[in-house]
Regions:
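Juxtamembrane and boundary regions of transmembrane helices in multi-pass small-molecule transporters
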Residues: 2, 167-170, 174-229, 234, ...
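Hydrophobic transmembrane alpha-helices of multi-pass small-molecule transporters
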Residues: 1-87, 199-294, 433-436
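Core transmembrane alpha-helical segments of multi-pass membrane transporters/permeases
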Residues: 44, 48, 56, 67-100, ...
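Juxtamembrane helix-boundary/capping and inter-helix hinge elements in multi-pass membrane proteins
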Residues: 61-63, 75-79, 155-159, 184-196, ...
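Alpha-helical transmembrane segments of multi-pass membrane proteins
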Residues: 85, 116-129, 155-172, 327-340, ...
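Re-entrant/interfacial helical elements at transmembrane boundaries that shape
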Residues: 138-150, 166, 177-190, 346-360, ...
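Hydrophobic alpha-helical transmembrane segments of multi-pass integral membrane proteins
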Residues: 83-92, 114-146, 318-358, 375
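Membrane-interfacial loop-to-helix junctions in multi-pass transporters
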Residues: 76-82, 107-125, 151-161, 205, ...
Length: 436
């Protein structure tokens, strides 16, 4: 007989319900920091150990039911969607590299952008694309292979280059009208998108301008190769198709499928053998294997935390001793941030904590437009700096580097978070903050 169980969280867990997350962080982050090597402990092993621990501490279920509950999280529709995107992204990235699309796009970028504006140009491109398409994942999928190619050609540190793309991608993820997080935050707080946009704009644009200035300054020392190779315009077409369809708002999976087809058609036209194209796609998909395993293990572990009452425990603790508008806003920020830490999905974190945030806002007379902005901004902050988030995993997978090496080079999410904290402390923007 197959194991079945109610997925509604029943156990009323305390800190023990959150302990699998602590086990993972200790195994991966703390151990890696102690030995000063983030490749010493594979992230898959850290997740496997913490997942086994999460299953072991689950109460009220036999072993078969615990494994079933874990599998419910691993096979969640959001997790599965991420897996399909990873598969298509791997196939596109490798086939684009094999037929020369990445080299052609890199050469075009080096030709168009002055050396000293290369870093700033990549950041602006990531901000613009993410603002246009409303998704950080789509932006990272489109730009990371180009960032890798630019790093190889210019000698710029690879994790630093990829971090520019990841950081810029969260600008639009947080601000775009069509972002899932914008929709979730405005719907849960019953406010109009354009009003939330105004508040968000005032908070995060200063952060983006500060980081842009840093990249312009740091770019002064960048020098491109003395002779950029001739641009093969026809090989740039796959990337133009990917960027064009992404900006037009086409579903990211269809964007990647069109990109894969275009690399095949143009590759064969320019001399790539048909089966070499197939081989490149296979190599790309296989290369995403570790990333997919991490995603499944993380999904299962985080679902177990939810089932054991970890998120409910956080909510009850953070809302217990709230006083004053500042305290109320900080409690909402902490609420959505920790929920995001436990779900690794900023949209789900907002949906989970949105109703509680609305109650807090009503109780302390907070402006719902700023409440929506706080939910969106702090969920994006946490999503941007966790090593097991979809954005960090896909960026590290495409670049072949550790997620922690990217996090160590991130500027924008931390600056955005600092500006958001200052906005709460200084009651900014005044129009939407009231008295503290």
């Amino acid at each position: 007989m197959s194991a079945t169980t109610d997925t509604t969280p029943k156990p009323k867990g305390g800190w023990w319900a959150l302990s699998p997350l602590a086990v993972f962080l200790c195994l991966y982050l703390v151990t890696s920091l102690l030995v000063n090597d983030f490749y010493k402990v594979p992230i898959t092993v850290a997740f496997l150990a913490s997942s086994c621990y999460a299953i072991a501490i689950t109460r009220g279920l036999n072993l078969e039911q615990r494994i079933y509950q874990f599998s419910v999280g691993a096979s969640n529709k959001n997790i599965m969607l991420m897996v399909w995107i990873f598969i298509l992204a791997g196939a596109f990235a490798q086939s684009a590299k094999q037929m020369g699309a990445i080299d052609a796009t890199v050469n075009l970028t080096l030709h168009i952008l002055p050396d000293n504006l290369l870093l700033a140009g990549i950041f602006i491109a990531a901000c613009f694309i993410s603002l246009s398409i409303g998704t950080s994942v789509g932006t990272i999928v489109a730009l990371t292979p180009v960032a890798v190619g630019l790093a190889e050609k210019t000698g710029i540190d690879l994790p630093y280059m990829v971090a520019i793309v990841v950081g810029g991608s969260f600008f639009g993820d947080n601000l775009s009208f069509i972002s899932d997080t914008t929709i979730a935050s405005t719907k849960t707080q019953d406010c109009v998108m354009r009003d939330k946009f105004r508040v968000n704009f005032m908070i995060v644009v200063p952060a983006a301008l500060i980081i842009l200035g840093i990249y312009i300054f740091q770019g002064l020392s960048v020098s491109a190769p003395p002779q950029v190779q001739t641009i093969e315009w026809i090989k740039v077409i796959p990337y133009l198709i990917v960027l064009g369809t992404a900006v037009a708002g086409v579903n990211v999976m269809l964007v990647l499928l069109l990109g894969i087809l275009s690399t095949g058609i143009i590759g064969i036209y320019t001399g790539t053998a048909f089966f070499d194209w197939f081989g490149a796609m296979g190599t790309g998909i296989t290369g995403m294997g570790e990333l997919i395993i991490i995603t499944l293990l993380a999904g299962g572990m985080l679902e177990t935390i939810r089932y054991n009452g970890g998120i409910d425990f956080i909510i009850s603790r953070l809302t217990r001793h709230v006083s004053g508008k500042r305290g109320a806003e900080f409690s909402i920020a902490a609420l959505v941030g920790i929920a995001n830490l436990c779900t690794a999905n900023n949209t789900i974190a907002i949906i989970t904590t949105g109703p509680i945030a609305k109650d807090i806002a009503l109780r302390f007379h907070l402006d719902r437009r700023k409440t929506a902005s706080i939910l969106d901004t702090f969920s994006c902050l946490v999503q941007g700096i966790i090593p097991y988030g979809a954005q960090m995993l896909i960026a590290s997978g495409l670049a072949g580097i550790s997620p922690i090496s990217i996090i160590g080079n991130l500027y924008y999410p931390f600056c955005m978070g600092t500006c958001a904290i200052l906005a709460i402390l200084l009651r900014y923007p005044r129009k939407y903050s009231g008295e503290g």
